[in-house]
Amino acid sequence: MKNILWSGLLLFLLPLAACSPQTTKTSETAGTREAKTLSIGAIPDQDPQKLQRQYDKLATYLEKELGVPVKYKPVTDYSAAVTAFKVGDLELVWFGGLTGVQARLQVPGADAIAQRDVDEQFHSLFIANKKSGIKPFKDISGLKQLKGRTFTFGSDASTSGRLMPQYFLQQAGLKLEDFKGQAGFSGDHDKTIKLVEAGTYDVGAVNEKVWEKRTQTKEVDLNKVEVLWRTPAYYDYHWVIHPSVKKKYGDDLAKKVQSAFFKLDPKVPEHQEILDLLEAQKFIPTQNSNYSQIEAVGREIGKIK
């Protein structure tokens, strides 16, 4: 009887013994991959579906170039991108000028490592609904026409959709109180364009590259909305890398990431698609000191304490 019981017990335990190590190994492999995954993100300055598509493609490219798993993690708003970078949930982030400064001030050792060719000479656009009767102008003094009009920015933390437009408005002698009602905050550039196009606001401030892309794809009704003024140039978007990647991947990861961006070649179809999605001709080096003007304006306007 005892022999029968022991035989039955062995038959029960043998499959478990065979399966358990494999299950543990699989779990450890998945856990190791997750721990080694480079998490990338971006401020949500455009339609979330467009962002998901472009950064998924970029993640695939970076994974191949860097030899480590790379995953794009979307965030809900600009401040969430800064917070996620601060706590290390995101390690490589596409920030605007303002959010990049905010992030680096909260993470000592973080570095701006790359920007598009257009980002060292970036511009905002003031756009208007044509029924507003406001005519395009060539000088900053023309902004005085906006007094008593309805106006919307993009995100509250946007460089091209809020910070620099407000700075230029102040240079022209306008305060937010000079607009009709309260100045709006649409949340992103696409929404600003649609709100002005619909006549919800007379005027809005938008990112020049987003405007160009949407007009090229005929997503804007130019019979209803037009550009009033193009601002002077300033430094804007850039990639910022978290200092924790040195311990996780080695001291040379930042240089490898830079090389991957600089390697993007419009003559290579796969690369051209990524560059088109990111609205770039190429990527170039940058450094933290390039954003000193943005930091100064941010402190002046109260967006940086």
Q: What positions do the PLM features span?
A:
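Short helix-initiation/N-cap motifs at beta->coil->alpha
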Residues: 72-83, 96-98, 176-194
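A ligand-binding cleft/hinge motif common to bilobed small-molecule-binding domains
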Residues: 94-107, 170-171, 197, 202-222
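Short beta-strand->loop
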Residues: 110-119, 179-182, 215-233
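Ligand-binding cleft/hinge of the Venus flytrap
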Residues: 56-67, 155, 160-185, 215-221, ...
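An extracytoplasmic/periplasmic, membrane-proximal ligand-sensing/linker region
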Residues: 20-21, 33-57, 234, 240-241, ...
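Short, well-ordered beta-strand elements
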Residues: 30-49, 68-73, 148-152
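C-terminal motif of bacterial Sec signal peptides marking the signal peptidase cleavage site
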Residues: 15-18
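A conserved helix-loop-strand patch within extracytoplasmic ligand-binding domains
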Residues: 116-172
